[in-house]
């Protein structure tokens, strides 16, 4: 079915006017953004910090490190069963309940292994559910000119949560009085998680806008039209609303009447493979090996006496915001290609410098300067990955799949992400990890993927969801 013509605007709206006109679209994902923030807090606690537990067994720390990833994978599989079938309220209320329970466990037993493990699993499950629902909702409610900015809330608020956790922990220990605090640091974490969960539930109740596509699938045409009018900032029926309604019908009819296998093979298999590779490369920047390498380099290079990973998290926030501002202006493919090439180059250089350090450590006179160079290269690597690879992959995830298979394909991508994170963590724990070889490998992979992305990734900037879907199933021009 051919795409409908796009009505042209008489004048280009400024960014401020775009925020004002489409403010309800940002409000529609405010609850999901709060859950992403809570997920960042837990990811920062479990991976970028050393989990605090009263058990002396090393296996306890290892399990706490990977538990959140297991929970995210389980939550995404659970979400694939009901997302785009029922109201988004179910996902948000489930996520809220899981977060509150996880926070209570942290408050009641802040150093007990079983309590902390259950909390990580519950909060990971909450994030997994919300990640699938949030990406689907953001893609469906967003105007095509701001879809990238709207979907980018996933990465921005995840990194903000990580940054908040690391900065709060640093301040907590740097300002600790001689007689200590009445609260344990894990209890503070639990209180913050509960507050964010309650805020997310309040936002969901206050700004409840269902996806017009879901309403159309449920044959609630009047409700769908009303929601479209609100979200598009149109006080009366206009060509833009008519076009949006017809686009929803096209998306619903695209894979109607086909078997799951046929839909998967015909329209979703190739986009799924592309996004798996892109997303897994992007998730390495949050992995335990990258974190541990930065800690080692920063202790020597920056003379850090306390965990300085918050500096890496600030780079993640900066890169994510930069990517969000560029993705709808310069295109998804362009920033993905550039960031893959530059991040791959930075990783390759880090591998070379680390190899030189470990081979010639006895002859290097200024070791701290060499490690300092590794730190700065890692800052650049983090910014490039967050601004381009992670951002573009998030936006592509909202555009690449058909309606019937979107939640399942997103769950497959998320599960593979978490499997990669767990694998890298276990390798670091139980294998003689070769840091130079690791960075050499991801450097080569990044540069090769950058070249391939130029030819095999479509450019979907300023396209409707239906146009993006069609574009993804053709060789890009």
What are these regions (language model features)?
Residues 127-153:
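Cytoplasmic helix-loop-helix junction between adjacent transmembrane helices
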Residues 179-251, 443-476:
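Central mid-sequence intracellular linker of multi-pass
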Residues 55-67, 294-315, 408:
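Loop-to-transmembrane helix entry
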Residues 35, 65-80, 93-95, 104-106, ...:
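C-terminal transmembrane bundle
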Residues 146-199, 411-424:
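Glycine-rich segments within core transmembrane alpha-helices of 12-TM secondary carriers
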Residues 2-25, 186, 233-298, 477:
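Flexible cytoplasmic loops linking transmembrane helices in multi-pass membrane transporters
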Residues 1-55:
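Cytosolic juxtamembrane N-terminal segment immediately preceding the first transmembrane helix
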Residues 58, 144-153, 302-303, 403-412:
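Loop-to-transmembrane helix entry/capping segments in MFS-fold secondary transporters
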